[in-house]
Each structure stands twice: as C-alpha cells, then as structure tokens.
C-alpha cells in the first residue's frame, strides 16, 4: 500500500517513518488468525460502501476542475548533480523546464538557445534524480482513509498515547460527528491487544468512535457507535465475520473481518458526503512529498467494481493530478471487464490501463500464502497456505490475457504459489506467447528461491517485491511463521 499495512513500498499515510525495532507479539492473534491479512485480497471498505449505498461514480462527478491558468515561464536549473539513468550520459549539471516539462538535460555549456535569458535556479551541488515509481498500491482505499487520524506505531509507541490523540481529535470534532483512527497495531504498540468499547468510551461518549487496525481486517468502536449500528447481545455474527463479546455475551467493541466492521462503518455519514476523487488527488500529493511521480494500482475493481474507472476519469478530467497513474484490473471482475471491452494501454499519459491482476494465494503473515512446506506448527488442510485460484484456472487466465495483449500481474507470496505462476507463464510461452513483451510481473514474490529467479529471468518476468514486509514482519517470519532457514 502502498499499502496501508506498510506492506507496500509507499506508505501514503506516514511517508517513511521509523517503527519500533521489535514486535511485542511475533504473530498477534488479529493477524495470524485472519485468513485475509492482505488488503489487496479482501477490501474491507467495499462491504461498508455497499451497505451505506455509497456511489463512488456520483461522488466523482462532484470534483471541480482546475481553473485555466497561464503556463509557468521557462526555468533553467543549474549547479545540480543530476543522475539521469541514461547510460550514454549518466551525469548532468543542468536541465531546462518548458511548459511544465523537462525539455533538455545536459551540461551548461551545451545549453540550447532556448535556455538563454530565462529564469535560473542554482541548486548549489544538490543531487537530482528522476521521479520514483510506486509499482503496487491501492488508491481508492487510501483515498478513503486519507483524512482519518493516524494513531499507528510510527507516531505513538503505546496504546495510551494513541488513545490520547483520539481524545484530542474528539475535542476538535463537533458533538455527534465521527472520530475515526487508523493504523493501530497492538503488535508494535505497548498496551492491550484490543481496543474495547470501554477504552474507546474513555475517548468520548459524545461521538461515535471507530479505529481501524493496521491490517484493515479488524476494527474497534465505542458504545455510541455500537448503539448507532443497533448491535447488542442478540445481534448474530455476520457470515464470515465475528462480533467480539465479553464473558456475558455483550458486544465488547471488537469487530473481526469486513462484514462485522461494515455494520458499524456504514453509519458514518462522511462516507456519503465525501469525495473520493479529492482523496485520490490528496494521495498523489502525499506521494510527491516523498519523490514519487508515478503510482500503479494493483487491483482495480475490488473496491467498487467498474465505478472505480469513473473515479480515475474524474481525477484526470480535474486537471489537478500531480503524479501519473497506472492501474491493473482485477481478475475477480473478469466478466465485467470483458463485457465492457477493456483493452491494455487505453488512456493517456496521466491515467492508463496497463495490467491484468490475478490473485493466486494469500499472505505469508496471515498463513495463507501457498507454501512448499507447512507453516511452523500448522496442521490440517491449510497447513501449507491457500490457493485462491485453481491451477488449471490460473494457467487458462494467464494464457487468455496474454493473448489479449495484457501485462499479466500474478499475486504470489508463497514459494509454491510462485511455482504455479512460473508454470502458468511457461505453458503460455510454449504456445508462442511472450510474457516479456508486456513486462509481466509476479506481485509480492516474497518467498523466492534461486532456481525460481533463474526461471523468471528465462521467461522475462519481473518481480514486484513486498519490501516493507522484511522490516515489518521479519522477526515474525523467523520466530513463528517459517523458521530461520526459510525466512
């Protein structure tokens, strides 16, 4: 996310913070017990938006366009140490900007006539690099959360400090309006494993309060929020989810999995009154702040189906984008995409459709990544993780989308899942299809062996690594998930 769980290389919420160096619990229950501990596999907001009858396409239409304005004057930047990424001329000292574009790069004595007499900016030896590319993030969920209060471990080492921040937020919020926090992670923040309604009642009893766990598959709320949702001891657990309860069977404010969280979140009026396109534009601005100039969504359609394309178009039409945007459509929506006649490469330099995303397994920290060997201490049918798509179906999907000209991106975390992905691409290559033609990828590619690297090179496949998970989950991988040798 950029995954908002710090699983992505760009964390749109916090930039590049330092986190505590050790986990309080190597694999806390709220992660290890969750069969969908990766937001790109199961989007928690989709159910809440459906229940709240929120139409993202309608929100997109409310986005104002930027007024026409004069183009900035030409600018010659000098005195720089420019890393060009051009092997023929790897270093330069100046560049010329015209009409908002870099028109020339080189050494000052070679500057074109157009550079004469224009405004100058002397960088006094500072280093300039090309903009960074964020290859795997999920824009609509980030946009939904961009104005929630960050109470995560990058800001607060303890749950008490996080709750104090929520208290400040509540005092600055009109009575009756929602106070929403995000990024809470009890595996890294000292204090209780869960934020119960009693703890959140200490934040406020005049506001509904809701907090998203950093996994996005666990939520916590106060008594006011439970009352708004009509949740009491008689409320049954939604299918595939759980309402946390105390010893007497009364709801304790802990909501496990999307359907349970949606029962509460749907009542947040900001869902309907917000503008997700504005949120997307804000995320682009946050990306710019850490040097990112192009972002790619890897799972379009899993949030609110084809309506997400309306959001992207409104972002483009606003004339206010500050970074380029690319996206891969989700295999889960294959029938709808085929019905709409979508093709690879449609769009322009600002917004373009570039990939077809297939999720083949789960997440390693959630013990659902498909592995050659069983997870530590795991038994039963899912001891080796889970395949989210049958092998023959994966083979067929890869072949079909390669024939259509798509850049196919296969989500594969476990080594067995990577084996299956490589096999699918290899079978297609035997049939005359070239995975390298569109730079096909294996997303996450987490548990990778040497022979798999060689096979990827042979097939012309690129890995898109979950860099953040090494920092965030490394100790858990060693101690509780894989063991030292595999980790």
Predicted features and spans:
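Aromatic- and carboxylate-enriched substrate-binding clefts and catalytic-loop regions
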Residues: 438-449
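Acidic (Asp/Glu)-rich catalytic clusters
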Residues: 315-318, 342-351, 435, 456-460
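Divalent metal-binding segments
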Residues: 2-6, 10-15, 19-62, 67-79, ...
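A glycine-rich, aromatic-flanked flexible loop/lid motif
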Residues: 282, 286, 420, 465-470
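Feature representing long, continuous alpha-helical segments
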Residues: 392-396, 419, 423, 440, ...
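Active-site-adjacent C-terminal substructures of enzyme catalytic domains
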Residues: 447-487
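Polar interaction faces of repeat-based domains
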Residues: 423-434
């Amino acid at each position: 996310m950029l995954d908002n769980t710090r699983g992505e290389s760009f964390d749109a919420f916090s930039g590049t913070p330092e986190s505590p160096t050790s986990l309080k619990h190597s694999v806390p229950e709220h992660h290890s017990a969750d069969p969908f501990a990766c937001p790109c596999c199961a989007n928690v907001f989709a159910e809440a938006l459906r229940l709240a009858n929120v139409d993202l396409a309608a929100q997109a239409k409310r986005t104002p366009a930027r007024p026409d304005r004069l183009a900035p004057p030409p600018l010659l930047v000098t005195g720089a140490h420019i890393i060009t990424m051009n092997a023929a001329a790897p270093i330069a000292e100046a560049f010329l900007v015209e009409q908002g574009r870099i028109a020339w790069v080189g050494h000052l004595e070679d500057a074109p006539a157009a550079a004469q007499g224009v405004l100058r900016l002397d960088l006094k030896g500072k280093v300039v690099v090309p903009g960074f590319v964020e290859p795997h993030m999920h824009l609509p969920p980030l946009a939904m959360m961009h104005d929630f209060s960050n109470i995560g471990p990058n800001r607060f080492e303890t749950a008490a400090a996080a709750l104090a921040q929520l208290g400040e937020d509540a005092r600055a919020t009109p009575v009756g309006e929602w106070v929403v926090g995000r990024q809470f992670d009890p595996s890294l923040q000292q204090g209780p494993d869960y934020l119960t309604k009693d703890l959140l009642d200490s934040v406020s009893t005049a506001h509904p309060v809701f907090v998203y766990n950093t996994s996005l598959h666990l939520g916590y709320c106060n008594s006011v929020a439970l009352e708004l949702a009509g949740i009491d001891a008689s409320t049954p657990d939604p299918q595939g989810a759980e309402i946390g309860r105390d010893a007497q069977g009364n709801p304790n404010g802990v909501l496990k999995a999307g359907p349970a969280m949606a029962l509460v979140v749907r009542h947040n009026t900001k869902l309907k009154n917000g503008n997700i396109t504005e949120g997307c534009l804000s995320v682009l601005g946050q990306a710019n702040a850490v040097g990112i100039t192009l972002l790619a969504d890897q799972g379009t359609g899993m949030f609110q189906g084809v309506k997400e394309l309306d959001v992207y178009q409104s972002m483009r039409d606003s004339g206010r984008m500050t970074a380029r945007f690319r996206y891969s459509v989700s295999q889960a929506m294959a029938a709808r995409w085929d019905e709409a006649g979508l093709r690879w490469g449609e769009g322009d330099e600002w917004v373009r459709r570039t990939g077809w995303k297939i999720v083949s397994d789960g997440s390693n920290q959630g013990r659902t990544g498909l592995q050659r060997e069983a997870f530590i201490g795991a038994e039963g049918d899912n001891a080796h993780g889970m395949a989210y798509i049958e092998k023959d179906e994966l083979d067929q999907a890869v072949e079909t989308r390669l024939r259509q000209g798509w850049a196919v991106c296969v989500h594969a975390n476990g080594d067995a899942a990577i084996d299956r992905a490589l096999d699918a691409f290899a079978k297609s290559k035997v049939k005359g299809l070239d995975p390298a033609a569109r730079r096909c990828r294996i997303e996450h590619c987490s548990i990778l062996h040497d022979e798999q690297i060689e096979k990827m090179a042979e097939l012309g496949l690129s890995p898109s690594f979950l860099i953040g998970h090494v920092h965030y989950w490394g100790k858990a991988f060693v101690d509780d998930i894989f063991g030292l040798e595999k980790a």
